[in-house]
């Protein structure tokens, strides 16, 4: 990879990562499938299952860039959430919506954080191959469609405003106040759904949005909670593996990492901006169709090669 990955390839991969990390289509699944389908040196250089692949160091930079884009987009929310978190520690109780939302994110992050430390490398090396990724992408399609079916069943509950004067509130703070009404145990369940995204082909944002719909959230609030939950996990995953970026695996690819990270940041920012508006009025169905087509076509292509 050091000698072969061009800046154009780095930018293309970075942009692709930034979009697929937040769209409910699985960035890891695409990171496995696209090089295999393209073939040639991409299949050799861009391998996530190889134990010592330099591509793993490259991905670290992209994860940090994606998390940075989420932090920039939601910076006002994170200022309030962090203030609420430290306020709750100082007063030793949860009193406000911001404090409650902070702890919902904390309890929702712990399960996937522990599972990631224990299982990420095992899943990546054993299942990070084209056929399992395509199969899980099909399963992701089923999950997204099932989420829409469940949403219709609980729609009367989800449409009731959780905050008494919610109709007088507008924008992000109103959504955060609605999210703060979730019981902590539901926050744990929605956050724990991210564990499934360790499987290549299962989307982190998709599975948490589905879990949110299942627990009665609207599409808008489920997507917002999904992106807030994803931020600390994506950032922690990147920071945890930064030594790989500056170690032997990252030798000679600093320029490519920077170029790819810039592309990833820009595309992730545009993606989250688009999706937060998209889910105000629309559903997961188009993404379910895409995953079904992409997963099925990939399986057929791989079988015929």
From Swiss-Prot:
Keyword Hydrolase recorded: yes
UniProt keyword list: Antibiotic resistance, Cell membrane, Cell shape, Cell wall biogenesis/degradation, Hydrolase, Membrane, Peptidoglycan synthesis, Transmembrane, Transmembrane helix
Keyword Metal-binding attributed: no
A Gene Ontology term for the protein's cellular component: plasma membrane
Membrane-protein topology: Multi-pass membrane protein
Catalytic activity: di-trans,octa-cis-undecaprenyl diphosphate + H2O = di-trans,octa-cis-undecaprenyl phosphate + phosphate + H(+)
InterPro entries to which the protein is assigned, alphabetical: UppP
Enzyme Commission identifier(s): 3.6.1.27
HAMAP family reported for this sequence: Undec_diphosphatase (MF_01006)
Family in the record: Belongs to the UppP family.
Physiological role: Catalyzes the dephosphorylation of undecaprenyl diphosphate (UPP). Confers resistance to bacitracin.
Entry protein name: Undecaprenyl-diphosphatase
Species annotation: Mycobacterium avium (strain 104)
């Amino acid at each position: 990879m050091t000698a072969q990955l061009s800046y154009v390839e780095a930018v293309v991969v970075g942009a692709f990562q930034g979009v697929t990390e937040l769209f409910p289509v699985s960035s890891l699944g695409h990171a496995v499938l696209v090089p295999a389908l393209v073939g040639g040196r991409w299949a050799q250089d861009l391998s996530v299952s190889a134990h010592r692949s330099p591509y793993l160091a490259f991905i670290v930079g992209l994860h940090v860039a994606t998390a940075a884009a989420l932090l920039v987009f939601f910076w006002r929310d994170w200022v309030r959430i962090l203030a609420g978190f430290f306020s709750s520690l100082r007063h030793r109780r949860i009193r406000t919506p911001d404090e409650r939302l902070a702890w919902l994110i904390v309890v929702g992050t712990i399960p996937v954080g522990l599972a990631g430390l224990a299982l990420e490398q095992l899943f990546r090396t054993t299942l990070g191959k084209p056929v399992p990724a395509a199969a899980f992408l099909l399963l992701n399609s089923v999950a997204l469609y099932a989420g829409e079916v469940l949403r219709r069943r609980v729609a009367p509950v989800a449409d009731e405003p959780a905050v008494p004067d919610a109709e007088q509130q507008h924008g992000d703070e109103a959504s955060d106040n609605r999210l703060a009404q979730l019981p902590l145990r539901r926050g744990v369940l929605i956050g724990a759904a991210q564990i499934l995204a360790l499987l290549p082909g299962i989307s982190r944002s998709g599975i948490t949005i589905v879990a949110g719909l299942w627990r009665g959230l609207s599409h808008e609030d489920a997507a917002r909670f999904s992106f807030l939950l994803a931020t600390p996990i994506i950032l922690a995953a990147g920071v945890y593996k930064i030594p790989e970026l500056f170690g032997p695996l990252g030798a000679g690819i600093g320029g490519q990492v920077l170029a790819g990270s810039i592309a990833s940041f820009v595309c992730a920012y545009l993606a989250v901006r688009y999706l937060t508006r998209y889910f105000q009025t629309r559903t997961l169905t188009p993404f379910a169709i895409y995953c079904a087509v992409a997963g099925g076509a990939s399986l057929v292509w791989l079988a015929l090669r």
